[in-house]
Amino acid sequence: MKKTTKALAAAVFAAAFVGFAANAADFPEMKLSLAHTAAASHAHNQAAKLFAKEVSDMTGGKVQVQVYPAGELGDQPALLDQCFNGGDVDILIASQSNMASYVPKLNALSAPFLFDSYDQAHKTIDNYVMPWMEKDVEEKMHMVPLGVFDYGFRHVTTKGITVKKADDLKGVKIRVPGSAGLLATFDALGANTQTIAYSELYQSLKQGVVAAEENPVATIFADSFYECQDNLALTGHFFDMQALLMNKDKFDSMSPELQKVIKKAGIDAQNLTRKLISGQESEIIEKLKAKGMKVYDVDKQSFKDKMGPAYEKIAKLCGKEELDNLIKAIK
């Protein structure tokens, strides 16, 4: 039965692919740029390359997507600006926090401890988040969402400090990105939050400017933070996601057939990040241990008990109704 099912699935995919290929002559020659800030070894770059390959394959090579990883074309605010204004970036991968500067209600997604598992997060993204944000992203950002990439659950790393409960972070100088939710989270814990550009984070850790940072394990490993941090606390305080976005004018200029190609490639790229980020998390933690990091489980309830002020701040930014509706959708 399993072999029959797999064979049928393969046949359906092949038929769909042939359908695209058969119409390859209908696609115009076109070059698109896709830029992001993740390391070349990161799952997001693998997904970006899959997107480029599928677009090329499904258009018979007529449409080529050039991928620019690791901030080659600028940091995320710069990439968003270029894409928003129809500059050199046609497609980009953007964080929720950077998108929230255009669409304030997206701040709701920055609330701490919203999700307990990858499965819960994925179901909420598919059934609520995508339709919830699509219209506003198109109207206020002038971009079309093509998918939501997993970035992973964020955890805390430290140098010379063991974190097992919330109070262990009190007074600790920690780098936090400019996300309203993450800043509110660590402020509520009594940490000494510092907003440092990601491009400067490694050197800041190495030089002791900050003693701690927080990121998904895939990022911690890909960017070699284990070289200047010796402890990993599995706080899982925030499920991070980033959107694959395309300039709306560019998308609208395409034929319906090419739009279908772009959207299919976007969802396939999204699903690859889900497979890689969640599927490799345990393996990456073992790799971090092998690099010398000590890994600790934490008392998550001690963290959750302190999140009241963080939720109040976030509700003011996104609107209490938006935050309440998101929480209801998750439950």
Residue ranges with predicted function:
Residues 1-31:
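Short, low-complexity disordered leader/linker segments with a strong preference
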Residues 10, 25-123, 129, 135-331:
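N-terminal secretory/targeting leader peptides
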